[in-house]
C-alpha cells in the first residue's frame, strides 16, 4: 500500500485524501491547525508547522511515498520549494508553474505570449469583471457596471472585460514531456462566483488543445487546472491554477474513470500517457447543499464549507456518497453517478430523500 502525505487539511486536502483512498492509499495529513477540517478523515494526522519544525517533516518523508502540498499559504509553498531536495520522497508539485499561475498578471502575460485567448484588460467601457491578483478567483470577484465603482476598488485589483458564458474547467497532468488532458467539467457558480456544483461536459477539442498548449509551454511537471469562459465570443481562458484542485477531481473520477492522484504519481514515476479517448457514457453530479434552520437546502460554495470544523463521510451506497461538513449550519457534499445523466439524476432524488428522512430537509 502506498502512503501519501498531504500538507494542508482544508478542502484541497479533502479532495486529494478522497481520491487517495479511492486508490487504496494511506493518507497522512499535516496541518498546523489542531482543528483542521479533515483531521478525522485522514488515516494519520500530525499537527505542527512545517516551517518551524522541518525536521518532523523530513522524518515523515522517510515513511511515505510522496508529499503533496494542498494549501495556498505562499510562505509554506516557498519553504517546501527550498527544502524539496532534502526529502526522502518526491514532492508532487510544480513550483515554477505555481509561481506563474498564482500571480494572475503573470498568468495573463503567459497566455498572451503563446497566443491563448483571454479577456481584455481594462476595457474602455463597462461592464467590468474585477478580481484580486493573487487569490482563488472567487474571492472578491464581482461585476462592476459603472465607472464610479472603479475608483473605489482596492489597490491591485485586476480589471477585465466581462465575458458572458459558462465557466468550464479542464485538468492537465504533465511529466515535463507528456501532458494528459483529462475531462471537461462545467462549473456551476453562485452570486459570489464560488462553485456549488460540478457536472461533466462532452469533449471540446478547442479547449483540449488550449489546455495542452498551456501545459506544454511551461513545461508542466505536476497538475494544472485550466478555467475558461465558453460563450458567444468563443473560449477565453480566465485562469490557470498549478495546484491540486478541489471539487472537479471527484466529478472527473466518476465521469471518466481517471483518478488524478494516481495520474499525478505516474507523472513523477514512470511518466504519463497523453489521453486519446475517454468514456462518454458516464455522468456525475457533485454539489454542496447547506441545511438551513427552516429545512431548506441551499446551494453554497467552498467559502461556506471552509468555515466548518469537521468534514467526513456520512452515507454511501452504489451511485451515492454523502459527506457532512459540521459547522454553524450543516453542509452536505453530495456525489451521484451513473451510466448516464438520467441514472445520476435518479440517484440524486434518492440522496435528497435520505436528507429528508434523516434531517427533515425540505425536498
From Swiss-Prot:
Cofactor section: Mg(2+)
GO CC, any one term: cytosol
Gene Ontology molecular functions: ATP binding; ligase activity; metal ion binding
Name its pathway: Amino-acid biosynthesis; L-pyrrolysine biosynthesis
The record ties this protein, via PROSITE patterns, to:
ATP_GRASP
Specify which residues bind D-ornithine according to the UniProt entry for this protein. Answer: 169-171, 225, 243-248, 302
A single Gene Ontology biological process assigned to it is: pyrrolysine biosynthetic process
Q: Which residues bind Mg(2+) 1?
A: 227, 239
Q: Which residues bind ATP?
A: 10, 31, 49-50, 72-73
Q: What happens when the gene is disrupted?
A: Cells lacking this gene are unable to translate UAG as pyrrolysine, and do not produce pyrrolysine.
The residues that the entry says bind Mg(2+) 2 are 239, 241
Q: Which domain of life is it from?
A: Archaea
Q: What does this protein do?
A: Is required for the biosynthesis of pyrrolysine. Catalyzes the ATP-dependent ligation between (3R)-3-methyl-D-ornithine and L-lysine, leading to (3R)-3-methyl-D-ornithyl-N6-L-lysine.
Family label = Belongs to the PylC family.
Question: What is the name attached to this protein's record?
Answer: 3-methyl-D-ornithine--L-lysine ligase
- To which species is this protein native? Methanosarcina acetivorans (strain ATCC 35395 / DSM 2834 / JCM 12185 / C2A)
- Where is the organism placed in the taxonomic lineage, from the top? Archaea, Methanobacteriati, Methanobacteriota, Stenosarchaea group, Methanomicrobia
Amino acid at each position: 500500500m502506498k502512503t501519501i502525505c498531504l500538507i494542508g487539511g482544508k478542502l484541497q486536502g479533502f479532495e486529494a485524501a478522497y481520491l487517495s483512498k479511492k486508490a487504496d492509499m494511506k493518507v497522512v495529513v499535516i496541518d498546523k491547525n489542531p482543528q483542521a477540517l479533515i483531521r478525522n478523515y485522514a488515516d494519520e494526522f500530525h499537527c505542527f508547522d512545517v516551517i518551524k519544525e522541518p525536521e518532523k517533516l523530513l522524518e515523515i518523508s522517510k515513511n511515505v511515498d510522496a508529499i503533496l502540498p494542498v494549501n495556498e499559504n505562499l510562505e509554506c509553498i516557498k519553504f517546501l520549494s527550498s527544502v524539496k531536495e532534502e526529502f526522502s520522497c518526491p514532492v508532487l508539485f510544480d513550483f515554477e508553474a505555481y509561481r506563474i499561475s498564482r500571480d494572475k498578471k503573470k498568468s495573463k502575460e503567459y497566455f498572451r505570449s503563446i497566443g491563448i485567448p483571454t479577456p481584455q484588460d481594462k476595457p474602455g467601457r463597462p461592464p467590468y469583471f474585477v478580481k484580486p491578483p493573487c487569490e482563488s478567483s472567487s474571492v472578491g470577484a464581482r461585476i462592476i457596471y459603472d465607472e464610479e465603482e472603479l475608483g473605489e476598488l482596492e489597490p491591485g485589483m485586476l480589471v477585465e472585460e466581462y465575458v458572458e458564458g459558462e465557466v468550464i474547467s479542464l485538468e492537465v497532468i504533465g511529466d515535463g514531456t507528456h501532458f494528459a488532458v483529462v475531462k471537461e467539467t462545467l462549473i456551476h457558480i453562485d452570486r459570489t462566483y464560488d462553485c456549488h456544483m460540478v457536472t461533466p461536459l462532452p469533449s471540446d477539442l478547442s479547449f483540449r488543445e488550449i489546455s495542452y498548449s498551456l501545459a506544454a509551454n511551461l513545461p508542466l511537471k505536476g497538475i494544472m487546472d485550466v478555467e475558461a469562459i465558453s460563450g458567444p465570443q468563443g473560449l477565453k481562458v480566465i485562469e490557470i491554477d498549478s495546484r491540486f484542485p478541489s471539487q472537479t477531481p471527484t466529478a472527473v473520477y466518476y465521469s471518466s474513470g481517471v483518478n488524478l492522484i494516481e495520474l499525478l504519481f505516474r507523472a513523477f514515476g514512470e511518466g504519463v500517457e497523453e489521453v486519446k479517448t475517454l468514456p462518454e457514457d458516464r455522468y456525475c453530479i457533485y454539489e454542496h447543499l447547506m441545511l438551513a434552520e427552516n429545512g431548506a437546502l441551499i446551494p453554497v460554495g467552498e467559502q461556506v464549507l471552509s468555515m466548518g470544523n469537521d468534514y467526513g463521510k456520512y452515507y454511501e451506497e452504489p451511485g451515492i456518497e454523502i459527506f457532512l461538513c459540521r459547522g454553524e449550519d450543516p453542509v452536505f457534499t453530495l456525489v451521484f453517478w451513473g451510466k448516464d445523466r438520467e441514472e445520476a439524476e435518479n440517484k440524486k432524488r434518492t440522496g435528497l430523500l435520505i436528507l429528508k428522512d434523516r434531517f427533515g430537509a425540505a425536498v
